[in-house]
């Protein structure tokens, strides 16, 4: 039976798009639920400045609360030098900072300038410095992000050759992994297959690649299947398919440095963790995940957030917000 690793990023990518703060006790409930369901790779938050990402204003406290569980790997986002310094400091303080996602690069320079106010060469130089700092600080695995591989909301379709060039440069710098990202849902399954086939031809170790697709146009699961056929074995998802760019409002207060959202609020998030796990189980893949338990957790997240999310598994099981509205004991 072939193995596929599902990495859950609900607590980071998922929550960063939410416009209301989630208390630590609810985050811990989600974290423990993911672990109990068998999820081994969990992205738990960001070391960004709390002025810009107030959802993670207590990330240091949360990091120290993380339970040490054999086989579970915790990932943190650290996109600039200050955030990297915080990650290293928390590692030194005893927090389980196992893996750090840094070096965020978009093949679209227009996107990079708008999102990060940097040129490509600025970002490559920063990535070079940060991977060195993290490895020297005792972080075992450092992952870079390559985004807008297939297209971006500013420039449109992007040539795949640019992404291969970026991948080469980042591996040469010493990154352990690359997160191949489609933040805009621009990929169709055929282009995803083309890209992943070349990625695996150039760098055939599947442990060095993770795919991160936002399911904006409803093709996320099809793209993940196309990638699996080419040998990709690690995929990022969120419970209920939540997530997206950082919220521009937090509990009624405008967040500093934000502008308009790139997309309408209809669909912004990733492939649903519970849907993907359910599908892989039916296809005969070994994920190590208890799909029923994960679906119950997805329903619990709907109740926490007070709305129905994009999960077919939760809807089919009848365990989510729509059912809880009529069951006071579930809330």
Where are each of the predicted segments found?
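Catalytic cores and adjacent flexible loops of soluble metabolic enzymes
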Residues: 1-331
């Amino acid at each position: 039976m072939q193995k596929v690793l599902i990495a859950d990023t609900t607590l980071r990518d998922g929550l960063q798009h939410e416009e209301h703060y989630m208390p630590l006790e609810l985050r811990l409930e989600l974290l423990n639920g993911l672990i109990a369901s068998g999820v081994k790779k969990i992205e738990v938050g960001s070391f960004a400045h709390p002025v810009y990402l107030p959802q993670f204003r207590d990330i240091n406290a949360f990091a120290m609360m993380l339970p040490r569980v054999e086989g579970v790997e915790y990932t943190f986002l650290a996109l600039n030098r200050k955030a990297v310094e915080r990650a290293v400091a928390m590692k030194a303080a005893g927090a389980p900072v196992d893996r750090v996602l840094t070096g965020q690069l978009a093949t679209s320079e227009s996107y990079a300038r708008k999102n990060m106010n940097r040129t490509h060469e600025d970002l490559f130089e920063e990535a070079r410095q940060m991977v060195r700092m993290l490895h020297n600080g005792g972080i075992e695995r450092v992952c870079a992000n390559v985004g807008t591989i297939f297209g971006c909301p500013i420039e449109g379709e992007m040539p795949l050759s640019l992404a291969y060039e970026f991948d080469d440069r980042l591996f040469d710098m010493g990154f352990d992994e690359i997160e191949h990202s489609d933040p805009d849902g621009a990929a169709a399954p055929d282009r995803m297959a083309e890209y992943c086939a070349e990625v695996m031809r150039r760098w055939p170790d599947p442990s060095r690649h993770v795919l991160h697709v936002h399911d904006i146009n409803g093709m996320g699961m099809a793209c993940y299947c196309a990638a699996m056929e080419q040998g990709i074995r690690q995929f990022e998802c969120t419970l209920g398919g939540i997530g997206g760019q950082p919220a521009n409002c937090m509990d009624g207060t405008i967040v500093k440095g934000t502008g308009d959202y790139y997309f309408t609020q209809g669909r912004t998030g990733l492939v649903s963790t519970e849907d993907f796990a359910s599908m892989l189980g039916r296809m005969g893949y070994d994920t190590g995940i208890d799909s029923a338990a994960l679906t119950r957790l997805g329903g619990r997240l709907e109740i926490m957030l007070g709305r129905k999310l994009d999960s077919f598994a939760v809807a089919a099981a009848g365990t989510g917000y729509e059912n809880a509205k009529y069951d006071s004991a579930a809330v």
